């Protein structure tokens, strides 16, 4: 009888876990289309892939019809294929990120199940991974980090399976997969796909002393396979664009990671708060999980391997000069497996202390955020409120979404932690509603699609369009499906591409703009600008005056010869 009861209990846990995963997938998928694209990242990747699809140039990335060598090609292929199948919409722009997040979740399930032969533990790992805040944000946001993270994850898994396999056939298969994942990772985001796995692997080999010489030889076999994958594209783009290799290696890698003038320069400790906050709603397990993996490192090699995977990547990006929150995404793959294992141990020992701490932390975080937003709207701590007077419905939605976070965690506490998996639904309110309560002052600066739709007819009928912001330029180009936008005053990330002789004419300084206008009196010209603030007088840009203009918050359209 006890055996039947235990079996039924296990089946119920599996069903409940699958139901939770289904809910999580819903709050990944549904918001993809109705949230406006963010500039500069999402509008950039949307436009590069649109132009690639339009021009059928599958080798050289172009942005606004200007060379753009910041990233390799694979991510753009994925986004172009997505746009081909799903059309010209926000869903297709973000689908690649969602898809590769799902691939990583599937890897977690298969890997956990192979290691521990425990279906419930494997499903718990997936639940934790998909509901981690930073994983969710990046998985519903169009950047290349979800894609490169998948290839890094696959590299690390395939090495473990290859190095621990006793069967020669499976060993060879996994070393081949290691080579493939490094190769495709390279044409997704460059040398990072090679550096992260190999640094992690060599440190692991050095510390464990497991067949070092033999394993290094096998890794060189994987490296050869990766070169075979990388070579065709590298050869073609190097043949067509002679300066690509120099720019890609020295500017996009050496300068980005160790150069004094690196992009997104931040201090060493930058990732510590991001790692803790990004781990929500599971941050309460973070330190105990890492500590447990460290304490069992001598007799539990897989847990030490997963811990080392986290530490090496975290330290690598912390040491690098250039930093963005998205870079540490691969750390959350092994972390979610370790957290699931930690929770299983708590349940087996009937210790609910960690579950309690985690739910209390979530309740405190939610309550603090809720109180801060309410008080900020009342007392305007930073000189102005988050929402305008006509946006109180957005404030209500914002408060409600945070209240859902608090309510679910209180339910877990008062139900004696039987339904701890509901923790994964903490962000469900924010996930579904966030796109509906973004303040206007942010929309009309960072999400320009709405403004572009308001002036769409003017832009579409323009003979020439100028913009002083690259993110805004790419948003205009994406919306009106024209890629010949002129860059006004600020070259931004297109500085390198604009240095080419065939693209120099696409940049106009503000002191030359008046003269350019006088030479094109018969043409309809639009100048779209992002202002420093909504009260900034656009005339300070020293552009010719016009009575035909439209402004909303920080975005303004100036019309000439209309």
Curated annotation (Swiss-Prot):
Entry keyword set: Cell inner membrane, Cell membrane, Glycosyltransferase, Lipid A biosynthesis, Lipid biosynthesis, Lipid metabolism, Lipopolysaccharide biosynthesis, Membrane, Transferase, Transmembrane, Transmembrane helix
Signal peptide start and end residues: none
Main subcellular localisation: membrane
UniProt membrane topology term: Multi-pass membrane protein
GO MF assignments: 4-amino-4-deoxy-L-arabinose transferase activity; mannosyltransferase activity
Gene Ontology annotations for the cellular component aspect, listed alphabetically: plasma membrane
Pfam families: PMT
BP-aspect Gene Ontology terms: lipid A biosynthetic process; lipopolysaccharide biosynthetic process; protein O-linked glycosylation; response to iron(III) ion
PANTHER family: MANNOSYLTRANSFERASE YKCB-RELATED (PTHR33908), UNDECAPRENYL PHOSPHATE-ALPHA-4-AMINO-4-DEOXY-L-ARABINOSE ARABINOSYL TRANSFERASE (PTHR33908:SF3)
Function: Catalyzes the transfer of the L-Ara4N moiety of the glycolipid undecaprenyl phosphate-alpha-L-Ara4N to lipid A. The modified arabinose is attached to lipid A and is required for resistance to polymyxin and cationic antimicrobial peptides.
Stated family: Belongs to the glycosyltransferase 83 family.
Protein's name in the database: Undecaprenyl phosphate-alpha-4-amino-4-deoxy-L-arabinose arabinosyl transferase
Organism: Wigglesworthia glossinidia brevipalpis
Taxonomic path: Bacteria, Pseudomonadati, Pseudomonadota, Gammaproteobacteria, Enterobacterales
């Amino acid at each position: 009888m006890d055996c039947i009861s235990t079996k039924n209990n296990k089946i119920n846990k599996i069903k409940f876990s699958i139901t939770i995963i289904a809910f999580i997938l819903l709050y990944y998928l549904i918001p993809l289309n109705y949230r406006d694209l963010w500039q500069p990242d999402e509008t950039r990747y949307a436009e590069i892939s649109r132009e690639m699809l339009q021009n059928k140039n599958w080798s050289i990335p172009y942005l606004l019809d200007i060379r753009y060598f910041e990233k390799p090609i694979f991510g753009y292929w994925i986004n172009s294929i997505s746009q081909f199948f799903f059309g010209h919409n926000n869903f297709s722009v973000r689908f690649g990120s969602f898809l590769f997040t799902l691939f990583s979740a599937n890897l977690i399930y298969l890997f956990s199940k192979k290691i521990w032969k425990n279906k419930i533990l494997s499903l718990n790992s997936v639940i934790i991974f998909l509901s981690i805040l930073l994983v969710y944000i990046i998985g519903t946001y169009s950047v290349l980090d979800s894609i490169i993270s998948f290839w890094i994850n696959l590299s690390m898994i395939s090495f473990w399976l290859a190095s621990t396999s006793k069967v020669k056939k499976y060993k060879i298969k996994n070393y081949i997969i290691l080579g493939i994942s490094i190769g495709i990772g390279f044409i997704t985001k460059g040398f990072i796909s090679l550096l992260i796995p190999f640094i992690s692997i060599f440190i692991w080999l050095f510390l464990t002393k497991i067949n070092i010489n033999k394993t290094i030889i096998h890794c060189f076999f994987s490296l050869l396979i990766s070169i075979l994958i990388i070579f065709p594209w590298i050869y073609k783009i190097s043949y067509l664009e002679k300066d690509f290799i120099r720019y890609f290696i020295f500017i996009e890698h050496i300068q980005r990671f160790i150069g004094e003038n690196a992009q997104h320069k931040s201090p060493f400790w930058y990732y510590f708060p991001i790692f803790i906050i990004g781990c929500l709603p599971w941050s309460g397990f973070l330190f105990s999980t890492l500590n447990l993996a460290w304490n069992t490192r001598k007799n539990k090699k897989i847990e030490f391997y997963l811990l080392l995977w986290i530490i090496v990547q975290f330290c690598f990006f912390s040491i690098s000069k250039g930093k963005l929150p998205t870079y540490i995404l691969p750390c959350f793959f092994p972390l979610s497996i370790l957290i699931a294992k930690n929770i299983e141990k708590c349940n087996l020992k009937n210790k609910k202390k960690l579950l309690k701490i985690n739910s209390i932390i979530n309740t405190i975080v939610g309550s603090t955020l809720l109180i801060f937003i309410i008080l900020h709207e009342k007392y305007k701590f930073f000189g102005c409120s988050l929402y305008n007077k006509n946006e109180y419905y957005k404030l209500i939605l914002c408060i409600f979404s945070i209240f859902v976070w608090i309510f679910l965690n209180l339910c877990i506490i008062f139900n004696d932690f039987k339904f701890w998996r509901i923790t994964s639904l903490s962000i469900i309110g924010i996930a579904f509603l966030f796109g509906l309560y973004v303040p206007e002052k942010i929309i009309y600066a960072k999400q320009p699609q709405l403004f572009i739709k308001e002036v769409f007819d003017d832009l579409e009928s323009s003979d020439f369009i100028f913009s002083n912001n690259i993110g805004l330029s790419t948003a205009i180009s994406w919306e009106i499906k024209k890629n010949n936008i002129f860059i006004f005053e600020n070259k931004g990330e297109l500085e390198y591409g604009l240095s080419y002789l065939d693209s120099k004419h696409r940049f106009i300084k503000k002191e030359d703009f008046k003269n350019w206008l006088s030479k094109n009196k018969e043409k309809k010209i639009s100048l779209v600008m992002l202002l420093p603030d909504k009260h900034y007088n656009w005339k300070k840009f020293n552009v010719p005056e016009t009575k035909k203009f439209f402004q909303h918050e920080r975005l303004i359209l100036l019309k000439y010869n209309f």
